[in-house]
UniProtKB/Swiss-Prot annotation:
Microtubule inner protein (MIP) part of the dynein-decorated doublet microtubules (DMTs) of multiciliated respiratory cells and the distal singlet microtubules of monoflagellated spermatozoa. Forms an extensive interaction network cross-linking the lumen of axonemal doublet microtubules. It is found in: Cytoplasm; Cytoplasmic vesicle, Secretory vesicle, Acrosome; Cytoplasm, Cytoskeleton, Cilium basal body; Cytoplasm, Cytoskeleton, Flagellum axoneme. InterPro entries: SPACA9. It comes from the Eukaryota. Keywords: Cell projection, Cilium, Cytoplasm, Cytoplasmic vesicle, Cytoskeleton, Flagellum, Nucleus. This is Sperm acrosome-associated protein 9. Microtubule inner protein component of sperm flagellar doublet microtubules. Interacts with CABP1 and CALR. Interacts with INCA1. Interacts with microtubules. One of its GO terms (molecular function) is calcium-dependent protein binding. GO terms for biological process: axoneme assembly; flagellated sperm motility.
Length: 222
């Protein structure tokens, strides 16, 4: 749990930097829409932003801010997977996690999303922009962050035995793999030793000098 909380805090810090460049972000999207001759459709998915950056972005400044947005979305997607490893989930936490996974999907339609108070990202847009173009894409990250904070709040109320650190399964697997190699090497030694012992035992049971003829008493027969 501590690991996912720290990961979420790290993403929040990156988002604060991104939020300061919201006007640069929407301007970059506007430039890409012009280059793509796609001025009618709203920005409706993460995949659309990805496509704009790869095919219609001609400015290094625009590319940098678009990449910042996509990187944050990618980290949120990875954090969803980490959440699944913390505990098996309850109906409440599973519902929150499913919402997060849906929102962070590359193809999910986010055009109708609107972040409300205390978020003010939509307020920084003009009415036309907020309604028709960028209201959804600027609302995406803060809405996901809110859901993830709510997930953590519910998860922290669960019994301690239900929770497990995200790093534990990985650490356990690594320690198991690390221990298996020397154990296997050590385990082969007794078998080799036993094999040698069996060979020695069989050899020791053979009569010595078996190639010599049987002993006969002097001048007599057996």
């Amino acid at each position: 749990m501590n690991e996912v909380k720290e990961s979420l805090r790290s993403i929040e810090q990156k988002y604060k930097l991104f939020q300061q460049q919201q006007l640069t972000f929407t301007a970059a999207l506007e430039h890409c829409r012009e280059n793509a001759h796609d001025k009618i459709r709203p920005i409706s998915s993460i995949g659309q932003v990805q496509s704009y950056m790869e095919h219609y972005c001609n400015s290094s400044t625009d590319r940098r801010v678009l990449l910042m947005f996509l990187d944050i979305c990618s980290e949120l997607n990875k954090l969803c997977q980490h959440f699944e490893a913390v505990h098996s989930g309850t109906p409440v936490t599973n519902n929150l996690l499913e919402k997060c996974k849906t929102l962070v999907s590359q193809s999910n339609d986010l055009s109708s999303l609107r972040a409300k108070y205390p978020h003010d990202v939509v307020n920084h847009l003009s009415c036309d922009e907020a309604r028709n173009h960028y209201g959804g894409v600027v609302s995406l990250i803060p809405l996901i962050l809110d859901l993830m904070k709510e997930w953590i709040a519910h998860s922290e109320k669960l019994p301690r035995k239900v929770l497990q650190h995200v790093s534990e399964p990985q650490a356990h697997q690594e320690s198991t793999r690390g221990a298996a190699r020397p154990a296997q090497a050590i385990g082969t030694q007794p078998r080799a030793t036993k094999h040698k012992c069996r060979q020695l035992t069989k050899a020791s049971l053979k009569p010595r000098g078996c190639s010599k003829p049987p002993w006969r008493p002097p001048g007599g027969k057996l």
